Amino acid sequence: MPVLHNRISNETLKERMLAETEPRITISFYKYFSIAEPQETRDALYKAFESLNVFGRVYLAHEGINAQISVPESKVSAFRDFLYSFDPALNNVRLNIALDDDGKSFWVLRMKVRERIVADGIDDPTFNASDVGEYLKAAEVNAMLDDPDAVFIDMRNHYEYEVGHFENALEIPADTFREQLPKAVEMMQEHKDKKIIMYCTGGIRCEKASAWMKHSGFNKVWHIEGGIIEYARRAREQGLPVRFIGKNFVFDERMGERISEDIIAHCHQCGTPCDTHTNCKNDGCHLLFIQCPTCAEKFRGCCSELCSEESVLPEEEQRRRRAGRENGNKIFNKSRGRLNTKLGIPDPE
């Protein structure tokens, strides 16, 4: 029986990817549809994706599929043909092509079965996830941005909103999508008669959020088709003004796509304008934060003097210090509370 998961070290796989000469295309897609046997579907997809040398991260659940992947340029057509024919529900599913892509977004294929493709925390048997808001295309988005009766809601996390968002969009302050849903309903009560436009990176979160808002009694609900990625692509193709300001955070090695030249965030250590996310180089931390080149050199890529000092200790001493620490202090921690606690973020100058 073939091995349906990776057994090679991350370091080796990354070296192989960096040594490749063929360009790669970063693609994301999702689809809410019923999958009777997620594990069987996962195994069949894994075999096919691996045969096409696809890297990336794919989640499957009874409710559908969510994927961010990297495909060799010469295999994109074959990948599209396979995906569209794999299940009738996936025929002509929208493929979001990355805007700012060096082809180095992923170096391993990880495919997992989960309870949900988006962790929403919804436990309401009457909720109909298919009763979504209306789609908005790029020109319609721009028109809504000029409509005084419209309210744009950003359904992404605080660290995503911080580096880029639509003009005057509201942030729902929360660390996770599941926390945002009830807060969005609460915050929008005073705007119940307004037009509510929801958006996210590629569409998967705002689509479900639009259904939740309708379920919660809001009648005028829209969401941006294909999210920020599709909006920016279509606006550029059609010669429309791109009204998204800053950078679009993405969940891969790139950590962001440049949409406009505006730098709206600041280094979390010195306050200088900067929108470059990084993970603290201390293996006992890995906090996600924004760091300018000067501070990166000063702190050795770490989030604090303490982490900088710890990162150069002998490996055995580092392991001893890490022992017993909470898992919440480990890889890719993005909590706003932890960010503020560790860094004491300065006011922008």
Curated annotation (Swiss-Prot):
Q: Spans of biased composition, class Basic and acidic residues?
A: 316-328
**Record's keyword terms, sorted:** Oxidoreductase, tRNA processing
Report residue spans for region: Disordered.
316-349
| Catalytic residues (UniProt) | 200
Short name of any one Pfam family annotated for the protein: Rhodanese_C
Answer yes or no on keyword Oxidoreductase.
yes
UniProt record, GO biological process: tRNA modification
Keyword Repeat appears in the UniProt entry: no
Q: Which residues form the Rhodanese domain?
A: 146-240
Alphabetical list of SMART domains matching this protein: RHOD
In short, the EC number is 1.14.-.-
HAMAP family in UniProt:
TrhO
Cross-referenced NCBIfam families, in alphabetical order? Answer: PRK00142.1-1
Q: What is this protein called?
A: tRNA uridine(34) hydroxylase
Q: Taxonomically, what lineage is the organism? A: Bacteria, Pseudomonadati, Pseudomonadota, Gammaproteobacteria, Enterobacterales
